Amino acid sequence: MILLISDLHLQEERPDITRAFLDLLDGRARHAKALYILGDFFEAWIGDDAMTPFQQSICQAVRQLSDSGTAVYLMHGNRDFLIGEGFCKAAGCTLLADPSVISLGGEQVLLMHGDTLCTRDIGYMKMRRYLRNPLSLWILRHLPLATRQKLARKLRSESRAQTRMKATEIVDVTPEEVPAVMAAHGVKTLVHGHTHRPAIHKLVVNGEPARRIVLGDWDRRGWTLQVDAQGFQLEPFEFS
């Protein structure tokens, strides 16, 4: 069994989500061969050198899962792209490139966070290119802690405001981008998060049936994609 999740946006202000995640680690994830976290694991991340006690506790919990024998893979999201090898080493997880193709359920599957599929959101894509530039990343990681904290708050506030103002289709994936990316990677299944619109979409890639599986965000409930002998099962669950 393989589990895939994304968009938990873990933060101290949402202890219900934290409890649900820790319950998953102590439960189903212990029986999984691997757990994939496809971005926005944390609501914000300003550097491995600035972990709060809360973030350290999550790191330790992931480490316990890894030590129990479940492989853990972590992909950057738009909220936590400053997570580095320091955190991953401490947590016992592997940083996964976005995009990545893995063998899953007997086929090659493309994994992405999903933000790069939203090409109609021109403002966001421009900001993303700037922030992910290696020079920008180096500068961000070396800014004083107080400056990074202030910048993170500003970016989150602006992101929320802009998302509310933008049309739904702009902040969702660009329909023609999806089959193009899938064809470029030679896959018939794509799994991603980011849009907070959980669903399994049928489409055609290179004249053949294909599917796009969108993971759900953890807010009013949690979501997992379980891959086992029965196939790909996208399921919500209520917080206890």
UniProtKB/Swiss-Prot annotation:
Entry-linked SUPFAM superfamilies: Metallo-dependent phosphatases
Required cofactor(s): Mn(2+)
Protein name as annotated: UDP-2,3-diacylglucosamine hydrolase
Pathway participation: Glycolipid biosynthesis; lipid IV(A) biosynthesis; lipid IV(A) from (3R)-3-hydroxytetradecanoyl-[acyl-carrier-protein] and UDP-N-acetyl-alpha-D-glucosamine: step 4/6
PANTHER family attached to this UniProt entry: UDP-2,3-DIACYLGLUCOSAMINE HYDROLASE, UDP-2,3-DIACYLGLUCOSAMINE HYDROLASE-RELATED
Compartments it resides in: Cell inner membrane
The gene coding this protein: lpxH
One Pfam family, short name: Metallophos
Topology of this chain in the membrane: Peripheral membrane protein
EC class of the enzyme, as a word: hydrolase
Amino acids binding Mn(2+) 2: 40, 78, 113, 194
Gene3D superfamilies (UniProt xref): 3.60.21.10
Claim: Nucleotide-binding is one of the keywords in the record: no
A cellular component annotation (GO) from this entry: cytoplasm
Documented EC number(s): 3.6.1.54
InterPro entries noted in UniProt: Calcineurin-like_PHP_ApaH, LpxH-like, Metallo-depent_PP-like, UDP-diacylglucosamine_Hdrlase
Chain positions recorded as Mn(2+) 1 binding sites: 7, 9, 40, 196
Protein family according to the UniProt entry: Belongs to the LpxH family.
Reaction catalyzed: UDP-2-N,3-O-bis[(3R)-3-hydroxytetradecanoyl]-alpha-D-glucosamine + H2O = 2-N,3-O-bis[(3R)-3-hydroxytetradecanoyl]-alpha-D-glucosaminyl 1-phosphate + UMP + 2 H(+)
Recorded superkingdom: Bacteria
Major localization class: membrane
